[in-house]
Regions:
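Conserved C-terminal helix/tail region of periplasmic/extracytoplasmic solute-binding proteins
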Residues: 401, 407-491
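Hinge/lid segment of periplasmic solute-binding proteins
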Residues: 109-166, 175, 210, 315-323
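Short, polar/charged alpha-helical segment
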Residues: 51-75, 116
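Extracytoplasmic/periplasmic substrate-recognition and gating elements
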Residues: 308-384
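Short, solvent-exposed loop/beta-turn-alpha elements that line the ligand-binding surface or hinge
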Residues: 128-139, 183-187, 213, 218-220, ...
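Glycine-centered hinge/linker elements that transmit conformational signals in sensory
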Residues: 195-202, 233, 243-277, 317-324
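Extracytoplasmic "Venus flytrap"/periplasmic binding protein-like
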Residues: 69-142, 177, 290-291, 308-311
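Extracytoplasmic/periplasmic solute-binding protein
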Residues: 150-160, 165, 192-249, 289
Length: 491
């Protein structure tokens, strides 16, 4: 990292030699005064979009250039890097000045881990001075807070579109279960309610074939286990990785992790929860689960019909709600996901032009158009209302897929408006640690479920098969190992 930092700083020093970097001194209008329609400045914007999303973005760029760009003297040029990982690698190569690397862009869409690396190398511009307090107050607070991760609390990331996690369910096939048990979708208020419902569903489906022991079905699955851990601990009042003076410390609370364990690992090894295909929406399409937690941006992939193992197919409707909290949640927090834009250090004119573009693109008219056509949420409070979503939505509400996407966007708006949009702060090794924690819980659950299934196949009852895995001692051993390995990753 030190070599990388030195290399980047040397390159920036040579690029910016002779350029006077002007401070906005807290005035949001200073930057725009640097622009001259007679001497337009060119800004380069790196994105990772593809397909229809890229087409919509390129049309927005064209619209900007033909309006605000002409008026203020800004020419925006966008380059798609194909995917977010390629963009991150290419961006780091560019600022390091590697042979064959592209020129450093003015703006780039990145995750916070990449922004952290760039900030450590002193390559990012603080966006805060370009905005008035009134302007910043228009955005969902949590979206901006994600971009304030360094010691100076500078605003280094600017949001354009976001997503969250939603709880969805096949309400058509849920109805017979509800009729027999009284457990309706509306009765699920917490994750603990869901865990209890999944146990009942397993027993209910198992009882339908009394001649076959322990063939009950899983009710639920979720895509991101890392999100489950991070948002779960935060809801339960635990900041797992507090950062003080640039140094991260480990704060993994045993009680919080036991709640996570009891509401994912325990139901999973019992067969109440399940995961079979790559994504849980695929499991729902084949009837292997009825409910799932997944990204709001993937609502277009939610099933509109179920095809069973015998190739029979039936249409379904989907229940959509913001993800369920824990019963003891002390913070009404929801996951926020999605890359944001960072401003690379450039000339004062380029920086001013880039911020003008960001402000324009985040205005509800432009932002709603891009967000709705991308399946993501807009970033202002004004745009995150059901009425605003309904007025801007361009999908076909007469189709099940169109209705699913609309319901997901509406539920997301409610989640972001009435909850805390949460994202962890980046630090050295944060990406690897996130991957490790998610795989540690998910992998252990899958491994032990396989052992339980094998034991049942050999003649054990389910209660006998899971007994050794459900003890406090077993959890404590796993948790101690988890903490030790996590500590090693941040040292």
């Amino acid at each position: 990292m030190k070599k990388r930092t030195i290399a980047i700083k040397r390159i920036l020093a040579s690029v910016l030699t002779g350029v006077t970097v002007l401070s906005c001194m807290g005035c949001a209008n200073t930057g725009s005064k640097l622009l001259d329609p007679k001497n337009p400045v060119t800004i380069t914007i790196w994105n990772y979009y593809n397909g229809d999303q890229l087409t919509v973005f390129e049309k927005q760029i064209e619209n900007f250039n033909n309006t605000v760009g002409i008026e203020k003297g800004i020419v925006a040029v966008t380059v798609s890097q194909g995917d977010i990982d390629t963009l991150a690698d290419s961006l780091i190569d560019a600022v390091e000045g590697k042979a064959g690397a592209q020129e450093v862009p003015t703006l780039a869409s990145v995750y916070s881990e990449t922004a952290y690396i760039l900030d450590q190398a002193d390559t990012l511009t603080n966006l805060e001075p370009f905005f008035s307090e009134e302007e910043l107050a228009a955005y969902v607070p949590g979206f901006l807070n994600e971009g304030r991760f360094n010691e100076e609390n500078e605003l280094l990331l600017f949001p354009i579109i976001k997503s969250t996690e939603l709880f969805t369910a096949n309400e058509t096939d849920w109805e017979p279960f509800a009729a027999d048990t009284g457990i309706t979708l509306d009765s699920l208020v917490t994750k603990e309610d869901l865990t209890a419902a999944a146990k009942t569903y397993y027993e209910w489906t198992d009882a339908q074939t009394p001649e076959i022991a322990e063939d009950g079905k899983a009710l639920y699955g979720r895509d991101s286990i890392a999100n489950y851990i991070y948002i779960g601990c935060y809801q339960l009042g635990q900041d797992m990785f507090p950062v003080t003076n640039g140094k991260v410390t480990l704060n993994m609370n045993r009680d919080a992790f036991k709640v996570l364990w009891d509401n994912y690992y325990i139901p999973y090894i019992n067969g109440y929860f399940g995961s079979y295909a790559k994504f849980r929406s695929e499991d729902a399409k084949t009837g292997k689960i009825l409910a799932l937690t997944s990204s709001s941006a993937s609502a277009g992939y939610l099933p509109t019909a179920v095809t069973l193992a015998d190739d029979s197919t039936h249409d379904i409707s989907i229940f959509v709600e913001k993800d369920l909290p824990f019963a003891d949640a002390s913070i009404n927090a929801v996951v926020q996901q999605g890359a944001s834009y960072c401003l690379l250090k450039a000339t004062p004119e380029q920086e001013a032009g880039a911020v003008e573009f960001l402000k324009w693109f985040a205005e509800p008219e432009q932002n709603m158009d891009f967000a709705m056509k991308s399946g993501y949420s807009p970033v202002t409070l004004e745009a995150n209302t059901t009425d605003a979503i309904k007025n801007a939505y361009t999908g076909d509400l007469t189709t099940a897929e169109g209705q699913n996407i609309f319901n997901a966007l509406s539920a997301s708006a409610d989640a972001f408006t009435n909850g805390v949009a949460y994202a962890t702060k980046p630090f050295q090794g944060s990406k690897d640690l996130r991957t490790f924690l998610g795989e540690a819980l998910e992998g252990r659950a899958a491994e032990d479920r396989a052992a339980v299934a094998a034991a049942i196949g050999a003649g054990a009852t389910r209660e006998e098969a899971v007994a050794d895995f459900c003890t406090e001692e077993y959890f404590d051993t796993w948790f101690a190992e988890l903490c030790n390995q996590a500590q090693a990753l941040i040292e």
